[in-house]
From Swiss-Prot:
Its EC number is 3.6.5.n1. This is Elongation factor 4. The keyword Nucleus does not apply. SUPFAM superfamilies: EF-G C-terminal domain-like (SSF54980), P-loop containing nucleoside triphosphate hydrolases (SSF52540), Translation proteins (SSF50447).
Amino acid sequence: MPQPTRTDPALIRNFCIIAHIDHGKSTLADRMLQLTGVVEERQMRAQYLDRMDIERERGITIKSQAVRLPFTALDDVTYILNLIDTPGHVDFSYEVSRSLAACEGAILLVDAAQGIEAQTLANLYMALEHDLTIIPVLNKIDLPAAQPEKYAAELAGIIGCEPSDVLRVSAKTGEGVEELLNEIVARIPPPVGNADGPARALIFDSVYDTYRGVVTYVRVVDGQITNRERIQMMSTGATHEMLEVGVISPEPTKVDSLGVGEVGYLITGVKDVRQSRVGDTITSAAAPAAEVLPGYRDPKPMVFSGLYPIDGTDYPVLRDALEKLQLNDAALVFEPETSAALGFGFRCGFLGLLHLEITRDRLEREFDLALISTAPNVVYRVRMEDGTEHTVTNPSEFPSGKIAEIREPVVKATVLTPSDYVGPIMELCQGRRGVLDGMEYLSEDRVEMRYTLPLAEIVFDFFDQLKSRTKGYASLDYEPSGEQAADLVKVDILLQGQVVDAFSAIVHRDNAYSYGAEMTKKLRELIPRQQFEVPIQAAIGSRVIARENIRALRKDVLAKCYGGDISRKRKLLEKQKEGKKRMKMVGRVEVPQEAFISALSTESSGEGKDGKKK
């Protein structure tokens, strides 16, 4: 078997699998591991490459992995196939683009019973932009509901090949997998690079290991990377000593060096993944390369949410937990904030809703924390009339005074749906201030619709609405596309004239009344009755737009006046009224924790279900 150091690039094939969740990507990877014999039968477990429990449980891949598979093809030559596993979710599209940049080809894996989905389509377009060779494959042909002929024609139409070029496999039974491996060798071009030039390697993932610090996964483009040499990160200029170089097959195996086209891992003893960023170029510190590999960018958070421990004493635990998660997740940002209502917590920035959902899940599961998260927010840019600019990630930072313009982020969304549901989807998108950019029929019963939508309208419960209006058949993909000016206002919720910061929200002027009315009504049901009347108001600035009252609890002061005189009764009632008035002046409304939790969770219920969304 060719050694990693001395493998002829002509024998290497780097490929990834593009697939929607549940279309069988991990199962296909499992079959490949078994067929090439790198995992013994007795060590095999389902979803071998998905390491995190949450990945196995939700059936999604969050971090990329890379496995080296030796495969003897029909011509009796042993080729090295590097399978680079990619995340399939829209929040992680930058990670996907870096994984694709490390490959020369991609397997487009589609469920033969369901057809292609919006995210798969988005990742396919990304693969075509990277000039990858696409091998279309229909999986699950053993299912009784499979319609391979129909979907082969659909795939052929999208990629521009013949329906007969579409391979058919069943990852579950293993049928057609060997033929697929032979096709990979035949169709995907070998990597090209300058073996004698300065070393350049692309980082496509980095993982934090408790014992050894950060493990960085790389694909060598030019030159070679040798153990024990000093390397330099080209985006930051930082240099590190290399402690170990290796390949994964599928357990880490040490080697002396990695040559052109090889995929492997490096360990430098760095303790923080933010120093080894996905998409960065690694070069030798002694003879650095001049050109950076294209496509690197810093991950920017799109959605912000406050995370607060339900038990205030857990604050330091939450801080440590976030720092630990950040070791493995360079896109997560957080800063401490306090809220009069919820106490101490953190304002966290995420790539999208699934990222938020998964981070919250991991905090609760791995660190045993009970958390409240405030409604997700996007980043607004507010320009005042005096020319100053504010960046707002939290409604409480919203400036008061004369505002010239507010700009909000927008996304280009693609919805794939059966053609019967075009009406309800248009209605939903227009209700969310969407603008239709165009629509295309992929086949007679499937439509691709393209919309420009404000990100703020998607982060709430857009996905749930989309699924419920299309009986779960539509799929959504979106990518950021700049910002637009919008007529937005901040709605405050006041309890007895005091603003409760946790419930403030920035909404479009047209939706302000419905948000205010809904929140006041909800709080009226959740806050227990006090000894005095409590007004709940929703206000924009100083203008109240909705109000509900919590009626006072009253003691029956007339119980002991049996027949008695009316003036006696009136005296007692007046006295009670006087007492209530005094109470109202000095009384404070205690909002129970449960009321916060249920008001915030119903308000951001979009998130709760959204994690399972795809």
